[in-house]
């Protein structure tokens, strides 16, 4: 089967690689550098499994800048373009998704479009009405950055949308896509759910908001423990050995961040509109409170250090270990709060060659020099290369994992 994938981020590329084991896949992107890398068997993103599969597996995959040619020949078109949260309108910016829909429909009269981008509840219904077609369906993704292909190979569940009154072809394509994902997975007995588009859209937003809730819960627990000088590690262990709670997603941090959780929680809150709620709003608020608390704690520790020059060293901007993504990283908001207090910030981030022009921080990518300059070293996730300056480190990473 010929499949086109719009977007080569961790969602699009991981799906493209997965499906190219048994199908002919064309990745569409607007960046020549990404297209060149994929066509040379290199991954433009950091993902161990994607890198290995591109290098070592027999894949039928190519990348192109020629979107119309790719869409014209495709039987299925997967849309995995960004839907960033627009704080001005308090809603996802879906213009990239809509642009692809319009382009595909203009050159292809038979392909079914499968949206993998995270979208607002009701978006598929809106697009079907706008473009007067039922050939647009939704399949939420449940992937972790840097482990996206692994999560596609070992999925927790597969969800594809379909409506009762859809045409036989669209129904068949929805089932076909679910089967493609299931047959490519290495995990056996993966649950497959076919449901309405709005329900599938809700699953995605509520699932990520629950994960954000867990992060916020254990962060608030940690805030209490640190404030009362209690052992946060022991409290969390004592709670998490309860099977109903579990020993996962319980490691304190500076706040939830990354590409998905911040925007998905805000979008779900916006979707509530006039529907009664308090919990969803509290999750978003809790994350902001946590980042403010962390900044205050850093300032308190800094003031205790007897030094005429106060320098905060930020070790890594990435949100998670083994990630190459700084988007919506909680530490960036903490940095902004510290800078508003006229505190000098130096940053160690080997994935950057320079900071943005308006950033008043200083990039110091010589690790030993960084360690010497900083009075306190702040890190969301601890790394063993800080072991020799452990007395300088402030982190709430209790379990040394994400």
Curated annotation (Swiss-Prot):
Q: Where does substrate bind?
A: 141-145, 204, 208, 249-253, 257, 320
Reaction catalysed by this chain?
A: UDP-alpha-D-glucose + 2 NAD(+) + H2O = UDP-alpha-D-glucuronate + 2 NADH + 3 H(+)
- InterPro entries recorded: 6-PGluconate_DH-like_C_sf, 6PGD_dom2, NAD(P)-bd_dom_sf, UDP-Glc/GDP-Man, UDP-Glc/GDP-Man_DH_C, UDP-Glc/GDP-Man_DH_C_sf, UDP-Glc/GDP-Man_DH_dimer, UDP-Glc/GDP-Man_DH_N
Which of this chain's residues are annotated to bind NAD(+)?
2-19, 29, 34, 83, 118, 145, 259, 263, 327
Q: In which pathway does it act?
A: Nucleotide-sugar biosynthesis; UDP-alpha-D-glucuronate biosynthesis; UDP-alpha-D-glucuronate from UDP-alpha-D-glucose: step 1/1
Q: EC annotation?
A: 1.1.1.22
Output one GO BP term: polysaccharide biosynthetic process
Task: List UniProt keywords, sorted A-Z.
Answer: Capsule biogenesis/degradation, NAD, Oxidoreductase
A GO MF label = UDP-glucose 6-dehydrogenase activity
Task: State the Pfam families in the record.
Answer: UDPG_MGDP_dh, UDPG_MGDP_dh_C, UDPG_MGDP_dh_N
The catalytic residues are 260 (nucleophile)
PANTHER family from the UniProt entry: UDP-GLUCOSE 6-DEHYDROGENASE (PTHR43750:SF2), UDP-GLUCOSE 6-DEHYDROGENASE TUAD (PTHR43750)
To which protein family does this belong? Belongs to the UDP-glucose/GDP-mannose dehydrogenase family.
Q: What does this protein do?
A: Catalyzes the formation of UDP-glucuronic acid which is required for capsular hyaluronic acid synthesis.
This chain's protein is named UDP-glucose 6-dehydrogenase
